[in-house]
Amino acid sequence: MAIELFYDADADLSIIQGRKVAIIGYGSQGHAHAQNLRDSGVEVVIGLREGSKSAEKAKEAGFEVKTTAEAAAWANLIMILAPDTSQASIFTNDVEPNLNEGDALFFGHGLNIHFDLIKPADNIIVGMVAPKGPGHLVRRQFVDGKGVPCLIAIDQDPTGDAQALALSYASAIGGGRAGIIPTTFEAETVTDLFGEQAVLCGGTEELVKTGFEVLTEAGYEPEMAYFEVLHELKLIVDLMFEGGITNMNYSVSDTAEFGGYLSGPRVINADTKERMKDILTDIQDGTFTKRLIANVENGNTELEGLRAKYAEHPIEETGAKLRDLMSWVKNPLTETA
């Protein structure tokens, strides 16, 4: 089924310009949303917890900074762009007491709404606007007169004009210049989590580490293994990003292409696909989210333990040494980004 696309011509910018918008959080997405909205003629304040390190950055960018509760009380559209694991407490303590009938509560990711961690009153508009790119790209494209495609979704529409509001917001941050794609909270949440866990973060990390282990255990130098299974990964991903898998296969050598066709299915096979389906089920039925929340409630002990364990893998020490030889590569372990 073909997706439906909307553009600036389909959006009424005056709708969002008639709202007072509080951006909760001033990280990667927060700064881009706030600046793009302001440049589109929208009145914006930033809501942050007291003592937030982001407050000074927001003030330097010319924004009024309020506490989260003050920002929520001032606004009639609240966009929550804080980390997933902080959103429920932010909503309960600071946002919910300051919501009024007809206010809008927007999110950049659907997890908390889809899994009922946040349950706004029925008279509140609940929507999502999610650019498909990091905040710095959303901002840079906007400044250049372009945009990043945006997903929009509606969970509650007590007034009947929630989609028009979401379209207006997405257009104001540049989404309408590239394409605005309607979806659902469920689809955005599940596909996003699955992509992160099975492919982008979890799957890729394990593939790289296992390849490194196979080569080093066979007696090859760790440096050679690092170059072949991690360093060159960016070259391949960039080719896929720019033109798809066919573009990547066209661009590499015949030897690499032929070997990939033969050996790829030996690594990622029918058994792998079944395990990926298990991961999808854990996401769909809430198993993963329950574990995520339990980790937070236990002081992040599971996450911290996993983080420490994974950081000890030999590929990390090898990579840090090699990246120090590459003046064009930023190494966040030794440099301030």
UniProtKB/Swiss-Prot annotation:
Details of cofactor binding: Binds 2 magnesium ions per subunit.
Amino-acid positions noted as binding Mg(2+) 2 in the UniProt annotation, renumbered to this chain: D192, E228, E232
Gene3D superfamilies referenced in this protein's UniProt entry, alphabetically: 6.10.240.10, NAD(P)-binding Rossmann-like Domain
Listed name of the protein: Ketol-acid reductoisomerase (NADP(+))
Domain of life: Bacteria
UniProt keyword list: Amino-acid biosynthesis, Branched-chain amino acid biosynthesis, Magnesium, Metal-binding, NADP, Oxidoreductase
Pathway(s) where this gene product acts: Amino-acid biosynthesis; L-isoleucine biosynthesis; L-isoleucine from 2-oxobutanoate: step 2/4; Amino-acid biosynthesis; L-valine biosynthesis; L-valine from pyruvate: step 2/4
GO cellular component: cytosol
Residues in KARI N-terminal Rossmann domain copies: 3-183
PANTHER family membership: KETOL-ACID REDUCTOISOMERASE, MITOCHONDRIAL
Organism ancestry: Bacteria, Bacillati, Actinomycetota, Actinomycetes, Mycobacteriales
Function of the molecule: Involved in the biosynthesis of branched-chain amino acids (BCAA). Catalyzes an alkyl-migration followed by a ketol-acid reduction of (S)-2-acetolactate (S2AL) to yield (R)-2,3-dihydroxy-isovalerate. In the isomerase reaction, S2AL is rearranged via a Mg-dependent methyl migration to produce 3-hydroxy-3-methyl-2-ketobutyrate (HMKB). In the reductase reaction, this 2-ketoacid undergoes a metal-dependent reduction by NADPH to yield (R)-2,3-dihydroxy-isovalerate.
EC number: 1.1.1.86
Molecular function (Gene Ontology), one example: ketol-acid reductoisomerase activity
Family, similarity comment: Belongs to the ketol-acid reductoisomerase family.
GO biological process assignments: isoleucine biosynthetic process; L-valine biosynthetic process
Domain KARI C-terminal knotted: 184-329
Magnesium in keyword set: yes
Catalytic activity from the UniProt record: (2R)-2,3-dihydroxy-3-methylbutanoate + NADP(+) = (2S)-2-acetolactate + NADPH + H(+); (2R,3R)-2,3-dihydroxy-3-methylpentanoate + NADP(+) = (S)-2-ethyl-2-hydroxy-3-oxobutanoate + NADPH + H(+)
List of catalytic residues: H109
Residues that bind substrate: S253
InterPro entries tied to this protein: 6-PGluconate_DH-like_C_sf, KARI, KARI_C, KARI_N, KARI_prok, NAD(P)-bd_dom_sf
Binding site for Mg(2+) 1: D192, E196
The UniProt record lists the keyword Chloroplast: no
Requisite cofactors: Mg(2+)
Source organism of the structure: Corynebacterium efficiens (strain DSM 44549 / YS-314 / AJ 12310 / JCM 11189 / NBRC 100395)
Protein residues bound to NADP(+): Y26, G27, S28, Q29, R49, S52, S54, D84, T85, S86, Q87, G135
